[in-house]
Amino acid sequence: MNNLNDPPNWNIRPNARADGGDGSKWNYALLVPMLGLAAFRWIWSRESQKEIEKARKAYHQRTAAFQQDLEAKYHAVISEHRRAVAQLSLELEKEQNRTSSFREALISQGRKLAEEKKLLEQERAQIKQEKSRLQPLRNVYLSCLQEEDDWQRRAQHVLKEVGEALEERQNIYCSLIIPRSARLELEKSLLVRTSVDPVAADLEMAAGLSDIFKHDKHCGDVWNTNKRQNGKLMWMYLKYWELLVELKKFKKVEKVILEK
């Protein structure tokens, strides 16, 4: 390997030692590449160390950022869980309070029902006792009521006949062709009957009839053919006598019961 551009002494001669030449130049020729290689390795090692430090620093930065992000997410999750736990605790407390209130209400309602049941039992016992006491009076009441029903039927029959007679009397009074004597005869007959009939006498119908004959002068129009449109006071008395019959019926029953 000879370099033609270099001086002769710098060329490598394989047989230099055999020829008695200087071998140090050969050693220097080997040393230069070794030194270059060592320098290259040193430079390469230094640059590699820088890259490694740079990579390590970047790794630590990424690791620190990742750790911070992870810690932030961890704290956020913990905070969210704490809020959820607090909310659930509050709802649980409310539910417990509601359950406690409901239980107290049930207990109170149960006591109230027990008291009401006791009162009902007492009232039932009182009713049974009262029923036993009133049973004889009930029998008396029903018996009296039956008797008064018979009296009431007789009174209603009398009222029906008197009402029909009053309609006829008022029709004669309002008529332009029927003589006055017919009306007077009918009035006299009514007064006599109500004076001798026990039921009519009990209702004091004679006095009412006299009042009707004296004051009831109401008539329908000239062409009226409906007898019920004649008279006013007579209808008031008939209604009054109907109510009086009902009243006397219960007054008599009441009197009999109070005497027992």
Curated annotation (Swiss-Prot):
**Keyword terms:** Coiled coil
Coiled coil location: 76-139
Under InterPro entries, the record lists:
CCDC127
UniProt KW Coiled coil keyword:
yes
The record's section on PANTHER family has: COILED-COIL DOMAIN-CONTAINING PROTEIN 127
The name under which this protein is listed is: Coiled-coil domain-containing protein 127
